[in-house]
């Protein structure tokens, strides 16, 4: 693989993409609105299907000279799509501020704002997903917003791994034939579902043909072969590697056009694309260099899709994370380690391009090869924040035992979005359902249920730190407060999921999720084989450090009185600086392999997980839990007053999810692994995230790379589910903040995703800069 290179074609296409400006586009919103108006008396599923079909047949499309893979959901590169079905109120309020907001800016056109206000918004006012949720439960959701962030209130869910192998096997025509056969013999209540799937698949066929027609009409010689591929794919499944990759990209473009959601993930691409690659290699119709160039064109396409979020959500999901997660390596259905040339070519593509998308993941296990690990380490050393690593030894068994996933499906797990775990092609995992702020709940428990920042009564008044005579009394009150907010969160979640069923059925997605066509049931209504929902715990590290400080300094050693600590928290440590220093330095912290401290983390993660087992989601499936933050540790920290771990009010919480608080992991990276290994992996079946930062110099020698491989093998042996790395100097980040024009291509691992550092808001940049940096293992 070392002889492979990046071609001029790829360099030119990359440069053009990176120089493209981001705009908010209303083109699809215009079509959707017209179709809904023309078919006002039809059901929402039928209107959704007709509007997607119309968009596929009418949206203006474009191609770039020299592309090997074509297709996009807008004419422009990196345009964010206004999607009225999911929510219009926020865009109506924020349209003018999109170019200047603190995070994730988009340019806007005055004529688009005018058309939106005069023609689109008036129709959708009161009719969208956002309006339905606000009208039903909006007040209650707002009341708990400092503790719980309910997601998917104004956009589609996404966070799913379609059955790409099925799509490649049948293509849209084959899936349409299957749906038509089902329609002939279906029950009355299934009829509309099959009619909708046929409509959207007809649209998919036309969409592919339109790219052929465009290339022919514009006589673009460099794309003539690509045009033929597009026409062929509209009629039958792919046969060659190039055809398979083009078909795969069409699948994901259409999924985004249907739902405008993040985290539709290709999954184990090196496994299901390998037969096409191998066949072409054996026939001498494809070289490794040609295959790499095709993959790199696909990589560029992944980076052309950006997601338009409201201003508040942009804080929680900063840097345009779109979540095309590709997982390479790992075991097969029989438990054997499997990696191949495509695994290595995916790593080579990331090595060459260093772009934020796709979110490249490597699955490791006890038998992972030296070749794969060293190829991955080489890419890590370049500092793009990729790949991240997942541990089969930690992940598969809890999926089987805790969630009831069949062994073959668990072994074939994929990752969606950042670090969320899913089965491949048969699960609506709803993995980004909500985020639960442990630290705000503790704050309320210590202060009569009142917010330290506003004195507002938010939680139950169970007493205060002054009234809890023992540490056990505090724990009992904390449990009750957690239970109270879990109940509130679950009530809100049921409302949100029901609204998605009613307002955003997804006929096209349902054709590529196993069991939906068989059942005649949309995926939002429970058509998938597995129906999970995932809740994130935010942030265990701060919680552990706070409880450890209270336990040791207040109740055990009595070095600080209950009264004084509560006063210090209420005053944000003003006048209590000596106490703050004690809280920071006199108590061992999570991440240093101190057993009693680390076990506090496991205690509360398990408590939360067990409570979640009491609930089922609106599709009849179980809730499960994860530990990852995306970028929510910054805005969620802004909701929390001063905390007993010595943290000042409004400051960010720990990054990641399983990561220690930055600057407090003093015993090195191996100690961090040992601390994290004490967390029960049944608590992270929805995904867990461990961030680490190393200096680039560590990887300059062969010895350093071998030591890093041994560190990764220790990660596997300790059964830690996830780890990822930033490889960067603090000085470079500081310079990038001051001189962003000199660091436009600097990518950084934020949480479970990579973003351009200079595109992040200042507070998030500061948090990343201050993360612990390791010089050695």
Segments from the language model and where they lie:
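Low-complexity, highly charged intrinsically disordered N-terminal segments
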Residues: 197, 204, 208-211, 215
